[in-house]
Amino acid sequence: MDRLKPQSAVSGLPLATALMLDIFDEPIVFHRAYVPIAGGITAALFLSHAGYACADLPEDRGGWFTRTQNEWERDTGLTRREQETARRQLRERGLLEERRVGMPAVLWYRVNWARLRDSLERQSRSHWAGRLDE
């Protein structure tokens, strides 16, 4: 029966405090419009976060940024396999570019913003055709 008793503390924190910290942790947000374009929710989440990750890059980087697998998992909750699948889907659609640089190789990413915009425009025209006065 002891297994069923609620724990009174986690790492020195009262359980209610630890629970509240988890509940009010930063939410993971993605653009809903990316789901059909990216190939699913996982790829849409990856693409949304990639856009967020490169938002404040210096211009001399040309849009390229780097993230480790652990950083992606920490920031998005996606496992290694989910990341690999999302990356493949995005590469196949021309929405994400990748390159390996250095020794040991570091994986760099770049969102293809022109392709994303074209995809969003096509999707919007199709979705809203005949519903908006233009």
Give the ranges of each region predicted by the language model.
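Short alpha-helical interface patches
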Residues: 32-37, 95, 113-121
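Short recognition helix of helix-turn-helix/winged-helix DNA-binding domains
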Residues: 1-71, 104
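Intrinsic disorder/low-complexity segments enriched in polar/small residues
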Residues: 6-8, 27, 70, 85, ...
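Winged helix-turn-helix DNA-binding recognition segment
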Residues: 54-110
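Charged low-complexity intrinsically disordered patches
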Residues: 1-19, 113-134
